[in-house]
Amino acid sequence: MNDEIRIIPITTKKGLKTFIQFHYDLYRGHKFAIPFLRFDEMNTLDPKKNPAFEFCEAQYFLAVDSEARIVGRIAAIINHRANAQWNKKQVRFGWLDFVDNVAVSCALLRAVEKWGKSRGMNECVGPLGFTDMDREGLLIEGFDRKSTMYINYNYPYYKTHLESYPLYEKDNDWLEYRIRVPKETPAKFAKTAQMIESRYNLHVHKFTRRELTSGGMGRKVFEIVNETYKNLYDFQQLTEKQIDEYVNTYIKKADLNLVTGVVDGNAGNKLVAFGVSFPSFTDALREIGNGKLFPTGWLKVLKVLKWHKTDTVDLLLIGVLPEYRKKGANALIFADLIKQYRRYGFKWAEAMPQMETNTGVQSQWQYLESEQHRRHRCYKKKI
């Protein structure tokens, strides 16, 4: 391949579709990469549809070789709220994909650095999305494991390129665990759940659809997210518009047997913790192949969502208010969810990425048969 690489900024909706399409082309037929839903990608990247653009700005770039072939893509993002909250001047890079050519990866990263520097930024960091609800990190371990729709998958050579590019260094790692659903709820969870119910008057709460939508409980779930995650790596508080978007996108579609709350009977049944799971769409999305729900893809997704045609469940979010962590509220969540997992015949649970320094969360898995099987990394560089 000729190393004459041109970087083209995306300025049209047609260009954005081309930007999105490149990922499908690069990973077509891959055994472990999972095609993302196209409408999710478009809604996230479209400034008119993503509420994060109230405090973010972005520019998307394509890399084109001398034969006019698209050979890479990258998004440059500035999250002004996160920068203000953490007192940083960071430009983020995300949606990074490229062929195995150092000239391409270098040109893409330079484009983001130049764009960020022109806007007063002094550090480049990524892969990151607009917010912490987007996919984060470069896959550096677990290339032989099926991915999920919630995390990045990339070829092993990405890591080689990033670490050979001048001055990029590790900023943060996330670990992911695969957990065998036990045939019986572990005694640790069962006994702790019984104890904290009687000692602290904490109880499992199963939501109704109305509670989560018009009743406002869905908003309370994400208010707990804001409180629980506020001190984690580069987290910024979700806005009301973002919360409404996530309630409509995820909570309204959830199987409520797989959503568990914990309420405090001594505080007027205040919601103090929650866990949200979804059946895994991994195999369904692999069958669809191109990320399109129409004309037939929707049926494959529906079979998973409504009839649980999968052996794996994705544990998307867990949140416990700080003052209830030492009271064991998480034991109530797991005791209930494990029961629901067995009922649906799930054999495996995929825990979403956890910071490697978050040993408190990781310690939960010691009571279950689990394996840390993937690792994602975020890099940073002064510019």
Residue ranges and their predicted role:
Residues 2-5, 152-232:
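Acyltransferase donor/substrate-recognition loop-hinge adjacent to the catalytic core
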Residues 367-378:
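A structural motif corresponding to the C-terminal lobe/cap of the Radical SAM core domain
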Residues 83-167, 289-367:
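Acyl-donor binding region in acyl/amide transferases
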Residues 125, 178, 261, 276, ...:
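Short beta-strand segments
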Residues 70, 80-83, 132-134, 184, ...:
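Flexible loop/turn segments at secondary-structure boundaries
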Residues 23-66, 74-84, 206-318:
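A conserved beta-strand-loop-helix scaffold within acyl/acetyltransferase catalytic domains
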Residues 1-32:
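Generic start-of-chain signal for non-secretory N-termini
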